[in-house]
């Protein structure tokens, strides 16, 4: 397991070659897009898995493909990605001390949190959440 503590943005763009979003991961670029996705999740009865990450963070780069893989396997959840440098004020409001930090949200409220790139623990949390949610009836 690893995590990175906050650091200033560097001028080294070579770290941007890792795919952080893809699959069913929605990249959040504004507070408004965050609010829109949370409203969509609430409307659709989905639990949100939010990954607060940084492009310069080694453990974030390691866990990113796994996060994408989880998003593809578990379409009943909504997976969001927030770049802590791009949305620094917003990330600070979530009290992010290290990256990656994963929040699990239901109806906009935190129901779980995981700090660090611990793939087995992330898998365990996702599985636990899926197992705890009753099957939703099909919408007309």
Swiss-Prot record:
Q: Name one GO biological process term.
A: cell communication
**Residues lipid-modified (S-palmitoyl cysteine):** 4
Q: Which UniProt keywords apply?
A: Cell membrane, Disulfide bond, Electron transport, Lipoprotein, Membrane, Myristate, Palmitate, Phosphoprotein, Redox-active center, Transport
One GO term in the molecular function aspect is: oxidoreductase activity
**Chief location bin:** membrane
Instruction: Kindly list the residue ranges recorded as spanning the membrane.
Output: none
Consequence of substituting residue 4 to W: No effect on membrane localization. Loss of cell to cell movement
Q: Which gene encodes it?
A: TRX9
Give the protein's biological function: Probable thiol-disulfide oxidoreductase that may play a role in intercellular communication due to its ability to move from cell to cell.
Looking at the record, the residues that make up the Thioredoxin domain are 25-129
Name the record gives this protein? Thioredoxin H9
Q: Where in the cell is it found?
A: Cell membrane
A Pfam family found in this protein is Thioredoxin
Q: In which tissues is it expressed?
A: Ubiquitous.
Q: Where is this site: Contributes to redox potential value?
A: 58-59
Identify where the record puts lipid attachment of type N-myristoyl glycine: 2
Q: Which organism is it from?
A: Arabidopsis thaliana
Where, by residue number, is the active site?
57 (nucleophile), 60 (nucleophile)
Query: Per the similarity annotation, which family is this?
Result: Belongs to the thioredoxin family. Plant H-type subfamily.
Gene knockout outcome: Dwarf plants with short roots and small yellowish leaves.
Chain positions with Phosphoserine modification: 14, 136
Q: List the disulfide bonds.
A: 57-60
GO CC, sorted alphabetically, is: cytosol; plasma membrane; plastid
């Amino acid at each position: 397991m690893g995590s990175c503590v906050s650091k200033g943005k560097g001028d080294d763009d070579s770290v941007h070659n890792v795919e952080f979003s893809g699959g069913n991961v929605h990249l959040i670029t504004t507070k408004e897009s965050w609010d829109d996705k949370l409203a969509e999740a609430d409307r659709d009865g989905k639990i949100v898995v939010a990954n607060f990450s940084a492009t310069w963070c080694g453990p974030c780069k390691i866990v990113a493909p796994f996060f994408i893989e989880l998003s593809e396997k578990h379409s009943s959840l909504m997976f969001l990605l927030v770049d802590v440098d791009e949305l620094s004020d917003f990330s600070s409001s979530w009290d992010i001390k290290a990256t990656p930090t994963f929040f699990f949200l239901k109806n906009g409220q935190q129901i779980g949190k995981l700090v660090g790139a611990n793939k087995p623990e992330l898998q365990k949390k996702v599985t636990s959440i899926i197992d705890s949610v009753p099957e939703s009836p099909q919408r007309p």
